[in-house]
């Protein structure tokens, strides 16, 4: 019985670590703004996104990398240009009832 509880605790810890990284990535006003712009405009390159964000390309690239590493956005390279878009599947999963069940079992 103790072994089962330890395994469940480790599994929950791993799940929390997974979500911690995702939520840290979006817990920033600038990154939320980037996500909102991508929601409204779809796929965009840094050169078009930077003026909308009123941010240098290097600073924008820093924020995009964090969102990419968390799999919140996707990147597609076409020639020398990189285009970014929201990863809808990941966002749907992140905002799904599955996560709700961890904290509010009655919703499941």
Regions found by a protein language model. Name each.
Residues 32-39:
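Pre-recognition alpha-helix immediately N-terminal to the DNA-recognition helix
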Residues 29, 41-45:
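Short capping segments at the starts of secondary-structure elements
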Residues 56-59:
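Helix-turn-helix DNA-binding motif, specifically the short coil turn and the N-cap/start of the second
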Residues 18-19, 40, 83-108:
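Conserved segment of winged-helix/HTH DNA-binding domains
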Residues 69-78, 85:
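Beta-hairpin "wing" of winged helix-turn-helix
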Residues 35, 64-65:
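Short, hydrophobic-biased segments on the C-terminal half of alpha helices
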Residues 1-26, 70-72, 92-94, 106-108:
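N-terminal leader segment of winged-helix/HTH proteins
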Residues 48-50:
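A short acidic, leucine-rich amphipathic alpha-helix
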């Amino acid at each position: 019985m103790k072994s089962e509880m330890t395994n469940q605790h480790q599994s929950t810890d791993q799940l929390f670590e997974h979500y911690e990284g995702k939520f840290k990535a979006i817990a920033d006003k600038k990154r939320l703004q980037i996500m909102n712009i991508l929601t409204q405009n779809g796929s965009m390159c840094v050169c078009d996104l930077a003026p909308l964000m009123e941010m240098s390309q290097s600073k924008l690239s820093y924020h995009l990398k964090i969102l990419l590493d968390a799999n919140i956005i996707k990147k597609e390279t076409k020639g020398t240009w990189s285009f970014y878009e929201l990863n809808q599947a990941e966002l749907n999963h992140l905002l799904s009832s599955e996560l709700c069940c961890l904290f509010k079992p009655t919703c499941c």
